[in-house]
């Protein structure tokens, strides 16, 4: 493992720009400013709502080189400066020895930021190739191996919180995947105890939309590392759910936000899980049942305007 503390170098000299370049730059800067404000607000709200980071925490920011983890690191570095509490950050990348992985990209970027970081080198690629038949999705095994390595190294580093870059859309996709394929009403929690019981995992981007993160990543110029270096086939089930949600978001603006709100407003008494609600001891004298029999009343639905997905491509940036 390579462990480095670095300082930020001098800023590179500016270049001469034409008037058209200046106009485009001004527009992008305004757009970036709006996105920055929005993402910082949502990240800060998620951290506060779930008490993700506390005084004296050492946060391992898991950095893959993708848009989500770059954005998460950027948000947390800002929070570190602005928050009323003191906490430290160490950015960690797991180099899994995938063919063609650009080993210089992340160290160069992190040295430029002046953030403490560690590069953990483990050849999980060879293990995955040996265990998974050619042409099959390797993501599941790769993810389990990666988690185990990160968790064990977190203990060695004295880390108190492990930050992952999953966002709102990941959480909704996981909800539908579990419903469709596992028969479970289960999503991806913003905060949890890790598999080994020794770490607390947090997802600071839990309230952030993937499209906002993607736009922010482009405008910020992050040096993105592609996630298909291993040659694995994309998870078809997740891809189908992602496409379904994207179509809904275009046809029915606001539906994604409403569905995510549902994750935060669960009514166990109006589901069918005896383990989540004590139906056995329910009797007519119990008047504390949430919402009572209003479930039989007609729902008051807010009408939405259907949009032709072919005619009106939409990118929403609030």
From Swiss-Prot:
The keyword Transferase applies. Transmembrane segments: none annotated. It catalyses: cytidine(32) in tRNA + S-sulfanyl-L-cysteinyl-[cysteine desulfurase] + AH2 + ATP = 2-thiocytidine(32) in tRNA + L-cysteinyl-[cysteine desulfurase] + A + AMP + diphosphate + H(+). A motif (PP-loop motif) lies at residues 64-69. Gene3D superfamilies: HUPs (3.40.50.620). Keywords: 4Fe-4S, ATP-binding, Cytoplasm, Iron, Iron-sulfur, Magnesium, Metal-binding, Nucleotide-binding, RNA-binding, Transferase, tRNA processing, tRNA-binding. Pfam families: ATP_bind_3. Residues 16-27 have a biased composition (Polar residues). It is found in: Cytoplasm. Its EC number is 2.8.1.-. Binds 1 [4Fe-4S] cluster per subunit. The cluster is chelated by three Cys residues, the fourth Fe has a free coordination site that may bind a sulfur atom transferred from the persulfide of IscS. GO terms for molecular function: 4 iron, 4 sulfur cluster binding; ATP binding; magnesium ion binding; sulfurtransferase activity; tRNA binding. It is an enzyme of class 2 (transferase). Its cofactor is Mg(2+); [4Fe-4S] cluster. [4Fe-4S] cluster binds at residues 139, 142, 230. SUPFAM superfamilies: Adenine nucleotide alpha hydrolases-like (SSF52402). The thiolation reaction likely consists of two steps: a first activation step by ATP to form an adenylated intermediate of the target base of tRNA, and a second nucleophilic substitution step of the sulfur (S) atom supplied by the hydrosulfide attached to the Fe-S cluster. Catalyzes the ATP-dependent 2-thiolation of cytidine in position 32 of tRNA, to form 2-thiocytidine (s(2)C32). The sulfur atoms are provided by the cysteine/cysteine desulfurase (IscS) system. Belongs to the TtcA family. This is tRNA-cytidine(32) 2-sulfurtransferase. It comes from Pseudoalteromonas atlantica (strain T6c / ATCC BAA-1087). The lineage of its organism: Bacteria, Pseudomonadati, Pseudomonadota, Gammaproteobacteria, Alteromonadales.
